[in-house]
Amino acid sequence: MAIAVNQLTHAQSIAEQDPVVDYMNAIDNIEAELSAYSIELSDLYLGLGKSLYSREEYENARRAFQRGMQIERVNYGLDSLTQAPYLISIADTESYLGNWDESQKALENLYTINTKAYGANDVRMLPVLDQLLDWYMSTYKERTPKGGYSNLVISERIAARMYDILKTDMPLDDPDAPDRYRRLGYLQYFIANHIKQHGEPSDSGLSISMAGSSGRPSSATTSHMHFRRGKLALEKVIEALVEQPDSTEIDQAMAIAELGDWYLVFGQKFSATQAYQLAFDVLETTENPEQARTELFSAPRLIEFSMDKSPEAVLSDKSSESQLELSMMISTYGVANQIEVTSSPQSLTENQLSKLRKDMRSKRFRPRLVNGLAAEAPHSMLYDQPTPKG
Protein backbone atom coordinates (compact mmCIF):
# COMPACT_ATOMS: atom_id res chain seq x y z
CA MET A 1 0.00 0.00 0.00
CA ALA A 2 2.81 2.39 0.87
CA ILE A 3 4.35 1.81 -2.56
CA ALA A 4 1.03 2.58 -4.23
CA VAL A 5 0.57 5.79 -2.28
CA ASN A 6 4.12 6.86 -3.09
CA GLN A 7 3.50 6.21 -6.77
CA LEU A 8 0.31 8.27 -6.68
CA THR A 9 1.99 11.17 -4.88
CA HIS A 10 4.95 11.03 -7.23
CA ALA A 11 2.71 11.07 -10.28
CA GLN A 12 0.78 14.05 -8.99
CA SER A 13 3.92 16.02 -8.16
CA ILE A 14 5.51 15.66 -11.59
CA ALA A 15 2.38 15.62 -13.71
CA GLU A 16 2.98 19.13 -15.00
CA GLN A 17 6.30 18.07 -16.54
CA ASP A 18 5.00 15.27 -18.78
CA PRO A 19 1.54 14.43 -17.55
CA VAL A 20 0.42 11.69 -19.93
CA VAL A 21 3.59 9.62 -19.65
CA ASP A 22 3.81 10.14 -15.90
CA TYR A 23 0.21 9.14 -15.29
CA MET A 24 0.63 6.03 -17.44
CA ASN A 25 3.81 5.03 -15.60
CA ALA A 26 2.09 5.50 -12.24
CA ILE A 27 -0.85 3.40 -13.44
CA ASP A 28 1.45 0.60 -14.61
CA ASN A 29 3.29 0.56 -11.28
CA ILE A 30 0.12 0.42 -9.17
CA GLU A 31 -1.37 -2.31 -11.34
CA ALA A 32 1.84 -4.33 -10.92
CA GLU A 33 2.01 -3.82 -7.15
CA LEU A 34 -1.71 -4.12 -6.37
CA SER A 35 -4.37 -4.96 -8.98
CA ALA A 36 -6.05 -3.67 -12.12
CA TYR A 37 -9.01 -2.51 -10.03
CA SER A 38 -7.15 -0.92 -7.14
CA ILE A 39 -9.05 2.16 -5.98
CA GLU A 40 -5.84 4.20 -6.15
CA LEU A 41 -6.08 3.94 -9.93
CA SER A 42 -9.31 5.84 -10.37
CA ASP A 43 -7.84 9.28 -9.62
CA LEU A 44 -4.90 8.53 -11.88
CA TYR A 45 -7.22 7.67 -14.76
CA LEU A 46 -9.13 10.87 -14.13
CA GLY A 47 -5.89 12.86 -14.27
CA LEU A 48 -4.78 10.97 -17.37
CA GLY A 49 -8.10 11.68 -19.06
CA LYS A 50 -7.88 15.40 -18.28
CA SER A 51 -4.34 15.56 -19.63
CA LEU A 52 -5.39 13.83 -22.85
CA TYR A 53 -8.45 16.07 -23.05
CA SER A 54 -6.27 19.19 -22.80
CA ARG A 55 -4.28 17.84 -25.76
CA GLU A 56 -7.52 17.34 -27.71
CA GLU A 57 -6.98 13.57 -27.77
CA TYR A 58 -10.65 13.09 -27.04
CA GLU A 59 -11.07 9.40 -27.85
CA ASN A 60 -8.15 8.41 -25.63
CA ALA A 61 -9.44 10.76 -22.94
CA ARG A 62 -12.86 9.12 -23.10
CA ARG A 63 -11.31 5.67 -22.62
CA ALA A 64 -9.37 6.91 -19.59
CA PHE A 65 -12.49 8.44 -18.02
CA GLN A 66 -14.49 5.29 -18.70
CA ARG A 67 -11.79 3.12 -17.14
CA GLY A 68 -11.66 5.31 -14.03
CA MET A 69 -15.45 5.16 -13.72
CA GLN A 70 -15.38 1.37 -14.08
CA ILE A 71 -12.92 1.13 -11.19
CA GLU A 72 -15.19 3.33 -9.04
CA ARG A 73 -18.14 1.05 -9.82
CA VAL A 74 -16.22 -2.12 -9.01
CA ASN A 75 -15.13 -0.72 -5.66
CA TYR A 76 -18.19 1.28 -4.59
CA GLY A 77 -21.13 -0.04 -6.61
CA LEU A 78 -22.96 0.75 -9.84
CA ASP A 79 -24.82 3.67 -8.28
CA SER A 80 -21.92 5.23 -6.40
CA LEU A 81 -21.82 9.02 -6.28
CA THR A 82 -18.04 8.89 -6.72
CA GLN A 83 -18.68 8.41 -10.45
CA ALA A 84 -19.79 12.03 -10.80
CA PRO A 85 -16.53 13.63 -12.02
CA TYR A 86 -16.03 10.83 -14.54
CA LEU A 87 -19.56 11.20 -15.93
CA ILE A 88 -19.18 14.96 -16.36
CA SER A 89 -15.80 14.45 -18.03
CA ILE A 90 -17.27 11.82 -20.35
CA ALA A 91 -20.08 14.21 -21.27
CA ASP A 92 -17.54 16.94 -22.07
CA THR A 93 -15.45 14.58 -24.17
CA GLU A 94 -18.40 13.17 -26.11
CA SER A 95 -19.55 16.70 -26.91
CA TYR A 96 -16.20 17.52 -28.49
CA LEU A 97 -16.49 14.33 -30.53
CA GLY A 98 -19.92 15.47 -31.69
CA ASN A 99 -21.67 12.66 -29.83
CA TRP A 100 -24.35 14.77 -28.15
CA ASP A 101 -26.62 11.79 -27.47
CA GLU A 102 -23.79 10.08 -25.60
CA SER A 103 -23.18 13.24 -23.60
CA GLN A 104 -26.84 13.27 -22.64
CA LYS A 105 -26.68 9.61 -21.56
CA ALA A 106 -23.75 10.36 -19.26
CA LEU A 107 -25.58 13.31 -17.72
CA GLU A 108 -28.79 11.31 -17.29
CA ASN A 109 -26.70 8.70 -15.47
CA LEU A 110 -25.34 11.44 -13.21
CA TYR A 111 -28.89 12.57 -12.47
CA THR A 112 -30.07 9.00 -11.82
CA ILE A 113 -27.38 8.05 -9.31
CA ASN A 114 -28.11 11.22 -7.36
CA THR A 115 -31.87 10.59 -7.30
CA LYS A 116 -31.21 7.07 -6.03
CA ALA A 117 -29.05 8.50 -3.26
CA TYR A 118 -31.28 11.42 -2.22
CA GLY A 119 -34.66 11.22 -3.94
CA ALA A 120 -35.75 13.39 -6.86
CA ASN A 121 -37.22 16.19 -4.74
CA ASP A 122 -34.61 16.43 -2.00
CA VAL A 123 -32.88 19.78 -1.51
CA ARG A 124 -29.56 17.94 -1.81
CA MET A 125 -30.35 17.51 -5.51
CA LEU A 126 -29.87 21.23 -6.13
CA PRO A 127 -26.06 21.11 -6.56
CA VAL A 128 -26.23 18.38 -9.21
CA LEU A 129 -29.12 20.15 -10.96
CA ASP A 130 -26.97 23.31 -10.94
CA GLN A 131 -24.17 21.31 -12.51
CA LEU A 132 -26.45 19.92 -15.21
CA LEU A 133 -27.97 23.31 -15.99
CA ASP A 134 -24.51 24.88 -16.20
CA TRP A 135 -23.42 22.16 -18.63
CA TYR A 136 -26.35 22.53 -21.00
CA MET A 137 -26.17 26.32 -20.98
CA SER A 138 -22.39 26.44 -21.45
CA THR A 139 -22.53 24.07 -24.46
CA TYR A 140 -25.50 25.85 -26.04
CA LYS A 141 -23.31 28.05 -28.28
CA GLU A 142 -21.43 25.02 -29.59
CA ARG A 143 -24.56 23.59 -31.18
CA THR A 144 -26.71 24.24 -34.24
CA PRO A 145 -29.97 26.14 -33.65
CA LYS A 146 -31.86 22.82 -33.46
CA GLY A 147 -29.24 21.31 -31.16
CA GLY A 148 -29.23 24.47 -29.06
CA TYR A 149 -33.00 24.22 -28.74
CA SER A 150 -32.57 20.64 -27.48
CA ASN A 151 -30.21 21.97 -24.81
CA LEU A 152 -32.80 24.57 -23.81
CA VAL A 153 -35.65 22.05 -23.61
CA ILE A 154 -33.57 19.91 -21.26
CA SER A 155 -32.51 23.00 -19.31
CA GLU A 156 -36.14 23.95 -18.79
CA ARG A 157 -36.95 20.49 -17.47
CA ILE A 158 -34.02 20.75 -15.08
CA ALA A 159 -35.28 24.17 -14.02
CA ALA A 160 -38.76 22.74 -13.39
CA ARG A 161 -37.22 20.20 -11.00
CA MET A 162 -35.31 22.97 -9.26
CA TYR A 163 -38.43 25.11 -8.94
CA ASP A 164 -40.36 22.25 -7.31
CA ILE A 165 -37.55 21.67 -4.81
CA LEU A 166 -37.25 25.37 -4.01
CA LYS A 167 -40.98 25.71 -3.35
CA THR A 168 -41.03 22.61 -1.14
CA ASP A 169 -37.71 22.52 0.68
CA MET A 170 -36.08 25.97 0.55
CA PRO A 171 -37.64 28.71 2.71
CA LEU A 172 -37.81 32.19 1.22
CA ASP A 173 -35.47 33.54 3.90
CA ASP A 174 -32.69 31.22 2.73
CA PRO A 175 -29.80 33.43 1.51
CA ASP A 176 -29.62 31.49 -1.77
CA ALA A 177 -33.31 31.81 -2.60
CA PRO A 178 -33.29 35.18 -4.46
CA ASP A 179 -30.46 34.27 -6.83
CA ARG A 180 -31.88 30.80 -7.46
CA TYR A 181 -35.31 32.10 -8.42
CA ARG A 182 -33.74 34.89 -10.48
CA ARG A 183 -31.73 32.43 -12.53
CA LEU A 184 -34.84 30.36 -13.27
CA GLY A 185 -36.53 33.51 -14.51
CA TYR A 186 -33.62 34.47 -16.74
CA LEU A 187 -33.69 31.01 -18.33
CA GLN A 188 -37.22 31.64 -19.60
CA TYR A 189 -36.02 34.76 -21.43
CA PHE A 190 -33.12 32.83 -22.91
CA ILE A 191 -35.51 30.20 -24.30
CA ALA A 192 -38.02 32.75 -25.59
CA ASN A 193 -35.24 34.72 -27.29
CA HIS A 194 -33.92 31.57 -28.99
CA ILE A 195 -37.38 30.77 -30.35
CA LYS A 196 -37.78 34.38 -31.53
CA GLN A 197 -34.48 34.19 -33.45
CA HIS A 198 -34.58 30.61 -34.77
CA GLY A 199 -38.13 29.34 -34.45
CA GLU A 200 -39.20 26.19 -32.67
CA PRO A 201 -38.30 22.80 -34.22
CA SER A 202 -41.29 20.55 -34.81
CA ASP A 203 -39.41 17.61 -33.31
CA SER A 204 -36.55 18.02 -30.84
CA GLY A 205 -35.93 14.26 -30.68
CA LEU A 206 -35.55 14.27 -26.91
CA SER A 207 -36.19 11.43 -24.52
CA ILE A 208 -34.61 12.73 -21.32
CA SER A 209 -36.20 11.16 -18.27
CA MET A 210 -35.81 14.09 -15.87
CA ALA A 211 -39.43 15.09 -16.29
CA GLY A 212 -42.39 14.13 -18.39
CA SER A 213 -43.29 16.05 -21.51
CA SER A 214 -46.69 17.71 -21.52
CA GLY A 215 -46.75 18.07 -25.30
CA ARG A 216 -45.63 20.89 -27.56
CA PRO A 217 -47.53 24.15 -27.10
CA SER A 218 -48.79 26.08 -30.11
CA SER A 219 -46.60 28.88 -31.43
CA ALA A 220 -49.27 31.40 -30.39
CA THR A 221 -48.90 30.50 -26.71
CA THR A 222 -45.17 29.80 -26.48
CA SER A 223 -44.06 33.38 -25.79
CA HIS A 224 -46.77 33.91 -23.18
CA MET A 225 -45.86 30.62 -21.51
CA HIS A 226 -42.24 31.70 -21.06
CA PHE A 227 -43.35 35.19 -20.02
CA ARG A 228 -45.59 33.71 -17.32
CA ARG A 229 -42.98 31.28 -16.00
CA GLY A 230 -40.32 33.97 -15.84
CA LYS A 231 -42.73 36.40 -14.17
CA LEU A 232 -43.55 33.85 -11.45
CA ALA A 233 -39.83 33.29 -10.79
CA LEU A 234 -39.06 37.03 -10.58
CA GLU A 235 -42.02 37.55 -8.26
CA LYS A 236 -40.46 34.88 -6.04
CA VAL A 237 -37.23 36.90 -6.07
CA ILE A 238 -39.11 39.86 -4.60
CA GLU A 239 -40.85 37.67 -2.01
CA ALA A 240 -37.52 36.11 -1.01
CA LEU A 241 -35.80 39.49 -0.67
CA VAL A 242 -38.57 40.74 1.61
CA GLU A 243 -37.90 37.74 3.87
CA GLN A 244 -34.12 38.23 3.95
CA PRO A 245 -33.00 39.62 7.32
CA ASP A 246 -30.33 41.83 5.74
CA SER A 247 -32.33 42.93 2.69
CA THR A 248 -32.56 46.68 2.07
CA GLU A 249 -35.15 48.82 0.34
CA ILE A 250 -32.65 49.28 -2.48
CA ASP A 251 -32.40 45.50 -2.97
CA GLN A 252 -36.17 45.25 -3.09
CA ALA A 253 -36.56 48.23 -5.42
CA MET A 254 -34.04 46.75 -7.86
CA ALA A 255 -35.91 43.44 -7.88
CA ILE A 256 -39.25 45.18 -8.48
CA ALA A 257 -37.70 47.25 -11.28
CA GLU A 258 -36.35 44.06 -12.80
CA LEU A 259 -39.89 42.68 -12.84
CA GLY A 260 -40.84 45.90 -14.63
CA ASP A 261 -38.07 45.19 -17.15
CA TRP A 262 -39.57 41.73 -17.68
CA TYR A 263 -42.98 43.21 -18.44
CA LEU A 264 -41.43 45.76 -20.81
CA VAL A 265 -39.43 43.21 -22.80
CA PHE A 266 -42.56 41.11 -23.32
CA GLY A 267 -44.64 44.11 -24.39
CA GLN A 268 -46.66 44.49 -21.18
CA LYS A 269 -46.19 48.27 -21.01
CA PHE A 270 -48.94 49.08 -18.51
CA SER A 271 -47.70 46.46 -16.04
CA ALA A 272 -44.13 47.70 -16.55
CA THR A 273 -45.23 51.24 -15.65
CA GLN A 274 -46.89 49.99 -12.47
CA ALA A 275 -43.80 48.01 -11.44
CA TYR A 276 -41.45 50.94 -12.07
CA GLN A 277 -43.68 53.24 -10.02
CA LEU A 278 -43.70 50.74 -7.14
CA ALA A 279 -39.90 50.40 -7.29
CA PHE A 280 -39.61 54.19 -7.16
CA ASP A 281 -42.01 54.39 -4.20
CA VAL A 282 -40.26 51.63 -2.21
CA LEU A 283 -37.22 53.89 -1.89
CA GLU A 284 -39.23 56.46 0.08
CA THR A 285 -38.20 54.82 3.37
CA THR A 286 -34.47 54.75 2.62
CA GLU A 287 -32.12 57.09 4.46
CA ASN A 288 -31.74 59.33 1.41
CA PRO A 289 -34.61 58.60 -1.03
CA GLU A 290 -33.70 61.16 -3.68
CA GLN A 291 -30.09 60.06 -3.87
CA ALA A 292 -31.13 56.41 -4.16
CA ARG A 293 -33.64 57.21 -6.88
CA THR A 294 -31.07 59.24 -8.79
CA GLU A 295 -28.48 56.47 -8.62
CA LEU A 296 -30.91 53.76 -9.73
CA PHE A 297 -33.36 55.43 -12.08
CA SER A 298 -32.06 58.77 -13.41
CA ALA A 299 -30.54 57.24 -16.55
CA PRO A 300 -31.66 54.51 -18.97
CA ARG A 301 -30.22 51.04 -18.45
CA LEU A 302 -29.88 48.22 -20.98
CA ILE A 303 -32.09 45.29 -20.01
CA GLU A 304 -30.11 42.05 -19.99
CA PHE A 305 -31.44 38.82 -18.53
CA SER A 306 -28.07 37.12 -18.84
CA MET A 307 -27.39 33.70 -17.31
CA ASP A 308 -23.80 34.83 -16.71
CA LYS A 309 -24.25 37.91 -14.56
CA SER A 310 -25.77 39.17 -11.37
CA PRO A 311 -28.50 41.84 -11.59
CA GLU A 312 -26.09 44.45 -10.27
CA ALA A 313 -23.70 43.98 -13.18
CA VAL A 314 -23.62 46.88 -15.61
CA LEU A 315 -21.82 47.63 -18.83
CA SER A 316 -18.19 48.57 -18.41
CA ASP A 317 -17.36 52.24 -18.67
CA LYS A 318 -13.90 51.40 -19.96
CA SER A 319 -13.70 51.16 -23.71
CA SER A 320 -11.35 48.85 -25.53
CA GLU A 321 -9.79 49.18 -28.96
CA SER A 322 -12.53 47.01 -30.48
CA GLN A 323 -15.49 48.96 -29.09
CA LEU A 324 -17.56 51.80 -30.47
CA GLU A 325 -19.11 54.61 -28.47
CA LEU A 326 -22.77 55.18 -29.26
CA SER A 327 -25.24 57.92 -28.44
CA MET A 328 -29.02 57.59 -28.69
CA MET A 329 -32.37 58.62 -27.28
CA ILE A 330 -34.30 56.09 -25.21
CA SER A 331 -38.08 56.39 -25.48
CA THR A 332 -40.55 55.95 -22.64
CA TYR A 333 -41.05 52.39 -23.92
CA GLY A 334 -37.35 51.58 -23.72
CA VAL A 335 -36.66 51.73 -27.46
CA ALA A 336 -33.43 53.25 -28.83
CA ASN A 337 -33.81 55.99 -31.45
CA GLN A 338 -31.49 58.53 -33.12
CA ILE A 339 -28.59 56.08 -32.84
CA GLU A 340 -25.23 57.61 -33.73
CA VAL A 341 -21.62 56.42 -33.52
CA THR A 342 -19.68 59.07 -31.60
CA SER A 343 -16.32 57.30 -31.54
CA SER A 344 -15.00 54.40 -33.59
CA PRO A 345 -11.54 52.79 -33.95
CA GLN A 346 -12.19 52.55 -37.69
CA SER A 347 -14.84 53.70 -40.11
CA LEU A 348 -17.96 51.59 -40.59
CA THR A 349 -19.56 50.67 -43.88
CA GLU A 350 -23.18 51.62 -44.50
CA ASN A 351 -24.10 47.96 -44.16
CA GLN A 352 -22.35 47.66 -40.79
CA LEU A 353 -24.00 50.84 -39.55
CA SER A 354 -27.40 49.61 -40.68
CA LYS A 355 -26.95 46.29 -38.86
CA LEU A 356 -25.74 48.09 -35.74
CA ARG A 357 -28.83 50.30 -35.66
CA LYS A 358 -31.12 47.35 -36.29
CA ASP A 359 -29.48 45.44 -33.44
CA MET A 360 -29.79 48.39 -31.06
CA ARG A 361 -33.47 48.90 -31.93
CA SER A 362 -34.11 45.24 -31.12
CA LYS A 363 -32.80 45.75 -27.57
CA ARG A 364 -34.83 47.18 -24.75
CA PHE A 365 -33.78 49.65 -22.07
CA ARG A 366 -35.24 50.48 -18.71
CA PRO A 367 -36.26 54.10 -19.33
CA ARG A 368 -35.32 57.00 -17.13
CA LEU A 369 -37.83 57.45 -14.32
CA VAL A 370 -39.02 60.90 -13.25
CA ASN A 371 -41.29 60.78 -10.19
CA GLY A 372 -41.72 57.10 -10.93
CA LEU A 373 -42.88 57.64 -14.52
CA ALA A 374 -40.93 56.79 -17.66
CA ALA A 375 -39.37 59.72 -19.49
CA GLU A 376 -37.44 60.06 -22.75
CA ALA A 377 -33.72 60.52 -22.11
CA PRO A 378 -30.35 60.59 -23.92
CA HIS A 379 -28.04 57.66 -23.39
CA SER A 380 -24.51 56.65 -24.35
CA MET A 381 -22.92 53.21 -24.24
CA LEU A 382 -20.16 51.02 -25.63
CA TYR A 383 -20.74 48.53 -28.42
CA ASP A 384 -18.50 45.75 -29.76
CA GLN A 385 -16.94 46.61 -33.12
CA PRO A 386 -18.52 44.54 -35.93
CA THR A 387 -16.07 41.92 -37.17
CA PRO A 388 -15.13 42.56 -40.80
CA LYS A 389 -15.66 39.65 -43.16
CA GLY A 390 -12.76 39.03 -45.43
Language model features by range: what are they?
Residues E59-Y140:
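A generic tandem-repeat structural signature
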Residues V20, M24-I27, R62, M69, ...:
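Tetratricopeptide repeat
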Residues V20, I27, L34, L41, ...:
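Heptad-repeat amphipathic alpha-helical coiled-coil interaction surface used
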Residues D43, P85, R124-P127, D179, ...:
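Residue register of alpha-helical TPR repeats
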Residues M1-S51, R55:
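N-terminal leader/linker segments that initiate helical-solenoid repeat arrays
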Residues Q7, Q12-S13, S35-I39, D92, ...:
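Charge-biased low-complexity segments
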